[in-house]
């Protein structure tokens, strides 16, 4: 990926940071978006720029601001001269059981998981078409098999799967669009629904009998970014076999 340019949303931590490190090691230049994780974003930028100077830049933005999304693309192109890969990774995740769902929950979860990827992909499409690039969306295995009490999140990720396939048709043949559906990779922070007993139960239902790691998703990101010139409109489950047992 030497000379290629990647825009990663939610790139400061967890799966985003793991993907950033792997793509950077492959030679890519990175625009890393963050919303509130400034400390982590700057630390990652310093780490990677120490390896290859001026190869990583940061952009802070609230992805709920639809009108501001094109500026992420414009700033990436202004900084690095183009855009080859858009990784829609940023996501909100929390329970919304029926009876407790408010409009604010709907707007937040739909906004980060579906609306932002849609409008950011639309803004990036002209540049990606010029450079025959790709879009990679981080979906979820629960897009097809909804998780109890996570109604809005599951619906939003189902929409993102549909968006992935729709964009693959709309942007072909110049742009490839694929998705990655993680399983039990990193446990949500501060969510009591995922206590130790729940975690062990989930892991026991994976075929590989272990939780995954952000690097597992990063490897799939690199696969779609670098090695799949004849794959588009597909969703790859990286879940230790859990979705086959749900």
Where are these regions (language model features)?
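Short, small/polar-rich loop/turn modules that mediate ligand/substrate recognition or access, typified
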Residues: 172-176, 232-233
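A glycine/serine/threonine-rich, flexible loop-to-helix segment
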Residues: 45-46, 179-206, 245
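Substrate-binding pocket helix/loop in short-chain dehydrogenase/reductase
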Residues: 97-98, 102-110, 191, 198, ...
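Active-site helix of classical SDR
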Residues: 121, 156, 164
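C-terminal substrate-recognition "lid" of short-chain dehydrogenase/reductases
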Residues: 127, 210-238, 243
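Alpha-helical segment proximal to the catalytic Tyr-Lys
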Residues: 126, 168-173
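Conserved glycine-rich cofactor-binding loop
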Residues: 12-14
């Amino acid at each position: 990926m030497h000379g290629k340019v990647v825009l990663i949303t939610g790139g400061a931590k967890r799966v985003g940071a793991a993907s950033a490190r792997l793509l950077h090691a492959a030679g890519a230049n990175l625009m890393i978006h963050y919303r509130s994780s400034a400390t982590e974003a700057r630390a990652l930028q310093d780490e990677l720029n120490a390896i290859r100077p001026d190869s990583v830049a940061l952009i802070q933005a609230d992805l709920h601001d639809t009108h501001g999304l094109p500026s992420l693309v414009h700033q990436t192109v202004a900084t690095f001269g183009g855009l080859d890969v858009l990784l829609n990774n940023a996501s909100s995740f929390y329970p919304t059981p029926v009876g407790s769902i408010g409009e604010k929950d709907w707007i937040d979860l739909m906004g980060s998981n579906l609306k932002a990827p849609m409008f950011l992909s639309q803004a990036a499409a002209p540049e990606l078409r010029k450079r025959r690039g790709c879009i990679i969306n981080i979906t979820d295995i629960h897009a097809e098999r909804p998780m109890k009490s996570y109604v809005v999140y599951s619906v939003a990720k189902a929409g993102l799967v549909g968006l992935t396939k729709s964009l693959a048709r709309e942007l072909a043949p110049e742009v490839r669009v694929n998705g990655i559906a993680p399983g039990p990779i990193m446990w949500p922070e501060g969510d009591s629904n995922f206590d130790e007993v729940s975690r062990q139960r989930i892991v026991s239902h994976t075929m590989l009998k272990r939780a995954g790691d952000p690097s597992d998703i990063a490897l799939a990101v690199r696969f779609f970014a670098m090695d799949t010139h004849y794959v588009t409109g597909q969703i790859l489950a990286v879940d230790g076999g859990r979705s086959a047992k749900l």
